[in-house]
UniProtKB/Swiss-Prot annotation:
HAMAP family: dsDNA_bind. GO terms for cellular component: cytosol. Keywords: DNA-binding. Gene3D superfamilies: PDCD5-like. The keyword Cell membrane does not apply. One of its GO terms (molecular function) is DNA binding. PANTHER family: PROGRAMMED CELL DEATH PROTEIN 5. SUPFAM superfamilies: Double-stranded DNA-binding domain. This is DNA-binding protein Tpen_0471. The keyword DNA-binding applies. It comes from Thermofilum pendens (strain DSM 2475 / Hrk 5). Belongs to the PDCD5 family.
Length: 116
């Protein structure tokens, strides 16, 4: 094998790696765009089903507990779609839902501690 053949082989490996990297970047970009579209759709639905005060409370809570709020947003959308709650959801109703969620979470923590 001559030096030229080795150089060509090295260039081919570099080209393949570059293509692989570009495909990975494109896939990541597509995934991020899909996530952004889903988030925009969820926010639009929440704008329709929550009063401004309830949305403000949810936004404030999201700063402290983003995972909880994400799960709560999905639950609120499901409740509204199944007509299990009156729309628009006002701040008082949201507080009641949050209180029930907190109590359920607390009950699970107590059971977990007792079950040692």
């Amino acid at each position: 094998m001559s030096y030229d053949e080795g150089g060509e082989e090295l260039e081919e490996i570099k080209r393949r790696k570059l293509l692989e990297y570009q495909r990975a970047l494109e896939a990541e970009k597509a995934k991020e765009e899909q996530k952004a579209r889903e988030e925009a759709m969820r926010q639009e639905i929440l704008r329709r089903i929550l009063t401004p005060e309830a949305r403000a409370r949810l936004s404030n809570l999201k700063l402290v507990k983003p995972e909880l709020v994400e799960a709560l947003e999905i639950q609120l959308i499901q409740l509204a779609e199944s007509r299990s709650v009156r729309v628009p959801i006002d701040d008082e109703t949201l507080k009641q839902i949050l209180a029930r969620l907190y109590e359920a979470q607390r009950a699970r923590e107590v059971k977990f501690r007792v079950s040692f």
